[in-house]
Amino acid sequence: MNCVKINPCCLKGDIKIPPSKSLGHRAIICAALSEEESTIENISYSKDIKATCIGMSKLGALIIEDAKDNSTLKIKKQKLVSKEKVYIDCSESGSTVRFLIPISLIEERNVVFDGQGKLSYRPLDSYFNIFDEKEIAYSHPEGKVLPLQIKGRLKAGMFNLPGNISSQFISGLMFSLPFLEGDSIINITTNLESVGYVDMTIDMLKKFGIEIENKAYKSFFIKGNQKCKGTKYKVEGDFSQAAFWLSAGILNGNINCKDLNISSLQGDKVILDILKKMGGAIDEKSFSSKKSHTHGIVIDASQCPDLVPILSVVAALSEGTTKIVNAARLRIKESDRLKAMATELNKLGAEVVELEDGLLIEGKEKLKGGEVESWNDHRIAMALGIAALRCEESVTINGSECVSKSYPQFWSDLKQLGGDVHEWSLGE
């Protein structure tokens, strides 16, 4: 286990935002479904992205790093598909397992999906219901969903999904249904949450020549027998990661974020609007933020659940009360993120009450500091690291290595901006 100790400090400077993990997954998958070669630039090798690359390779993709630039990949689908049983380790990546399950069923296959940590317990019921309806054989251990063995082939038709589940299930079907022999419809039975992630999937597929007809987010018509074309695509910066630095600037600094796209479809771009509503000094042209006096607001997290950990930190250091609502899905992420943030922020001296679907936070000028746990969750660790900037004493975070899931260089970037960061390992 690794630990970091962060002393209170002011951050200043420019930071190159890592490539979007969400867009990286989608670009790699689309390229791997095309028999024409694609070039995907600006890939960051987080654990989650590596899991998707390895998984798509197991399903028949040829993925080669550019000899001159290892952040560039050459990808295409190989025509021959192995009939042997395929084993795919998804590590702790929910995107990988939920995207690749339907993809593995485009052709007749026998596949075992496995994973680590909390991933073995994150729900897959939406797919199990489809398997039962479409007569696809599957099995998994009692009490958990992985390892999951699947045997069969997906058939085109009607697919009913509720809108209040992870959008990863909807995206997973969108990656597979265009390649089936008949037309399909995804019918959304309740109000769709995380719309931005669905938009990103549809847009990425379109870049590779696949058309999906969006009928006001109530249903999606998907014509069968489509083919992906090869293309060249550069992954833009990740707003969910930029959120940590924009928040850091507002709490105690002056930070400019580089490599972001103001026209991005990323749902987490809403961080700009939320921080401004809280009184944060945000320049949307330069993607910069500086120390500001912020105040509490009501935050509806239904469309931006990944922002809740860092927004709860900003709320804990803002005048007045902040209420975060519609965030129940955070209880089944890498950790129970509502419980994790309430528990760890309170250790630092914050006033956070855990609600059934959110958090109630009474802000303070400063927190005390102390020792906290990462819950083996990258977003919890990074949020607590930013909280340390406005504490009276140092903050020690146990299990800090978990940031490798999405942002391996987070602690070094914190140092680069002037953070007083000390890292050490306690061994296994």
Swiss-Prot record:
Pathway membership: Metabolic intermediate biosynthesis; chorismate biosynthesis; chorismate from D-erythrose 4-phosphate and phosphoenolpyruvate: step 6/7
Enzyme Commission number(s) of this protein: 2.5.1.19
Catalytic activities: 3-phosphoshikimate + phosphoenolpyruvate = 5-O-(1-carboxyvinyl)-3-phosphoshikimate + phosphate
Keyword 4Fe-4S in annotation: no
Highest taxon listed in the record's lineage: Bacteria
Enzyme class: transferase
Keywords: Amino-acid biosynthesis, Aromatic amino acid biosynthesis, Cytoplasm, Transferase
Molecular function terms from GO: 3-phosphoshikimate 1-carboxyvinyltransferase activity
Function in brief: Catalyzes the transfer of the enolpyruvyl moiety of phosphoenolpyruvate (PEP) to the 5-hydroxyl of shikimate-3-phosphate (S3P) to produce enolpyruvyl shikimate-3-phosphate and inorganic phosphate.
Family: Belongs to the EPSP synthase family.
Name by which UniProt lists this protein: 3-phosphoshikimate 1-carboxyvinyltransferase
